[in-house]
Protein backbone atom coordinates (compact mmCIF):
# COMPACT_ATOMS: atom_id res chain seq x y z
CA UNK A 1 0.00 0.00 0.00
CA UNK A 2 1.39 3.39 -0.92
CA UNK A 3 1.77 6.16 1.65
CA UNK A 4 -0.90 8.14 -0.19
CA UNK A 5 -3.44 5.31 0.14
CA UNK A 6 -2.56 4.91 3.81
CA UNK A 7 -3.06 8.62 4.47
CA UNK A 8 -6.42 8.56 2.71
CA UNK A 9 -7.51 5.50 4.70
CA UNK A 10 -6.28 7.04 7.95
CA UNK A 11 -8.12 10.28 7.21
CA UNK A 12 -11.28 8.28 6.58
CA UNK A 13 -10.84 6.30 9.82
CA UNK A 14 -10.32 9.57 11.70
CA UNK A 15 -13.52 10.92 10.15
CA UNK A 16 -15.44 7.79 11.18
CA UNK A 17 -14.14 8.05 14.76
CA UNK A 18 -15.00 11.74 14.88
CA UNK A 19 -18.54 11.08 13.65
CA UNK A 20 -19.04 8.50 16.40
CA UNK A 21 -18.51 11.10 19.09
CA UNK A 22 -21.66 12.43 20.66
CA UNK A 23 -22.94 15.92 19.97
CA UNK A 24 -23.07 18.51 22.75
CA UNK A 25 -25.80 21.08 23.27
CA UNK A 26 -25.39 23.54 26.10
CA UNK A 27 -27.85 26.00 27.59
CA UNK A 28 -26.31 29.20 28.90
CA UNK A 29 -28.10 31.74 31.05
CA UNK A 30 -27.14 35.14 32.40
CA UNK A 31 -27.90 34.18 35.99
CA UNK A 32 -29.20 31.49 38.31
CA UNK A 33 -32.90 30.73 37.93
CA UNK A 34 -33.43 31.88 34.34
CA UNK A 35 -34.75 28.48 33.25
CA UNK A 36 -31.86 26.46 31.83
CA UNK A 37 -32.78 23.25 33.66
CA UNK A 38 -36.48 23.80 32.98
CA UNK A 39 -35.80 24.16 29.26
CA UNK A 40 -33.60 21.05 29.16
CA UNK A 41 -36.39 19.02 30.73
CA UNK A 42 -38.93 20.40 28.25
CA UNK A 43 -36.60 19.36 25.44
CA UNK A 44 -36.20 15.90 26.97
CA UNK A 45 -39.99 15.43 26.89
CA UNK A 46 -40.09 16.49 23.23
CA UNK A 47 -37.29 14.07 22.33
CA UNK A 48 -38.99 11.23 24.22
CA UNK A 49 -42.31 11.89 22.43
CA UNK A 50 -40.42 11.66 19.13
CA UNK A 51 -39.02 8.23 19.92
CA UNK A 52 -35.54 9.28 21.02
CA UNK A 53 -33.95 7.28 23.85
CA UNK A 54 -33.33 10.13 26.27
CA UNK A 55 -32.40 9.71 29.92
CA UNK A 56 -31.75 12.05 32.81
CA UNK A 57 -28.16 11.63 33.96
CA UNK A 58 -28.16 14.37 36.58
CA UNK A 59 -30.61 17.18 37.27
CA UNK A 60 -30.56 19.66 40.13
CA UNK A 61 -34.09 21.00 40.64
CA UNK A 62 -33.14 23.38 43.47
CA UNK A 63 -36.48 22.31 45.00
CA UNK A 64 -38.42 24.29 42.40
CA UNK A 65 -41.84 22.66 42.11
CA UNK A 66 -42.24 23.44 38.41
CA UNK A 67 -38.86 21.90 37.62
CA UNK A 68 -39.54 18.83 39.76
CA UNK A 69 -42.88 18.34 38.00
CA UNK A 70 -41.11 18.23 34.63
CA UNK A 71 -39.14 15.16 35.75
CA UNK A 72 -42.40 13.16 35.73
CA UNK A 73 -42.39 10.61 32.93
CA UNK A 74 -38.69 10.95 32.12
CA UNK A 75 -36.38 7.96 32.65
CA UNK A 76 -33.79 8.85 35.29
CA UNK A 77 -30.46 7.09 35.71
CA UNK A 78 -30.00 6.62 39.48
CA UNK A 79 -27.29 8.76 40.99
CA UNK A 80 -24.18 7.16 42.39
CA UNK A 81 -24.10 7.34 46.20
CA UNK A 82 -20.69 8.14 47.66
CA UNK A 83 -19.45 8.85 51.16
CA UNK A 84 -17.28 11.90 51.62
CA UNK A 85 -16.13 13.27 54.98
CA UNK A 86 -18.80 11.27 56.79
CA UNK A 87 -21.67 12.38 54.55
CA UNK A 88 -23.56 10.45 51.89
CA UNK A 89 -23.59 12.45 48.66
CA UNK A 90 -25.11 11.86 45.21
CA UNK A 91 -23.06 12.15 42.04
CA UNK A 92 -23.59 11.57 38.33
CA UNK A 93 -23.05 7.87 37.62
CA UNK A 94 -20.93 8.27 34.51
CA UNK A 95 -20.34 4.53 34.13
CA UNK A 96 -24.09 3.83 34.24
CA UNK A 97 -24.66 6.45 31.53
CA UNK A 98 -21.99 4.88 29.32
CA UNK A 99 -23.28 1.33 30.00
CA UNK A 100 -26.91 2.24 29.22
CA UNK A 101 -25.88 4.14 26.06
CA UNK A 102 -28.95 6.37 25.62
CA UNK A 103 -29.09 8.41 22.44
CA UNK A 104 -29.27 11.57 24.56
CA UNK A 105 -28.48 12.19 28.22
CA UNK A 106 -29.38 15.34 30.16
CA UNK A 107 -26.65 16.47 32.56
CA UNK A 108 -27.07 19.55 34.73
CA UNK A 109 -24.51 21.50 36.78
CA UNK A 110 -21.67 21.28 34.27
CA UNK A 111 -19.21 23.25 36.45
CA UNK A 112 -19.68 20.91 39.45
CA UNK A 113 -16.55 19.65 41.21
CA UNK A 114 -16.71 15.89 41.68
CA UNK A 115 -15.97 14.22 45.00
CA UNK A 116 -12.28 13.41 45.41
CA UNK A 117 -11.04 10.05 44.19
CA UNK A 118 -13.17 9.99 41.04
CA UNK A 119 -11.70 9.57 37.57
CA UNK A 120 -12.42 13.20 36.71
CA UNK A 121 -12.15 16.27 38.89
CA UNK A 122 -15.01 18.15 37.17
CA UNK A 123 -18.38 17.14 35.73
CA UNK A 124 -17.51 18.73 32.39
CA UNK A 125 -14.72 16.14 32.13
CA UNK A 126 -17.31 13.39 32.71
CA UNK A 127 -19.32 14.90 29.85
CA UNK A 128 -16.30 14.71 27.54
CA UNK A 129 -15.92 10.99 28.36
CA UNK A 130 -19.63 10.46 27.66
CA UNK A 131 -19.35 12.30 24.33
CA UNK A 132 -16.34 10.16 23.38
CA UNK A 133 -18.51 7.10 24.08
CA UNK A 134 -20.84 8.32 21.30
CA UNK A 135 -23.63 9.60 23.54
CA UNK A 136 -25.21 12.99 22.84
CA UNK A 137 -25.36 15.35 25.83
CA UNK A 138 -27.60 18.29 26.64
CA UNK A 139 -26.34 20.42 29.51
Each model region followed by its residue ranges:
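N-terminal pre-Walker A segment at the start of P-loop NTPase domains
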Residues: 1-15
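Conserved P-loop
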Residues: 7, 11, 20-95, 99
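ASCE RecA-like P-loop NTPase motor cores
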Residues: 23-25, 130, 138
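Loop/turn-to-beta-strand initiation segments
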Residues: 53, 101-104, 133-139
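Conserved nucleotide-binding/hydrolysis micro-motifs of P-loop NTPases
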Residues: 60-65, 104, 111-112, 137
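Charge-rich, low-complexity amphipathic helices
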Residues: 69-70, 119-120, 128
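Conserved ATPase-coupling elements of RecA-like P-loop NTPase cores
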Residues: 109-124
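Conserved catalytic/switch belt of AAA+ P-loop NTPases
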Residues: 125-132
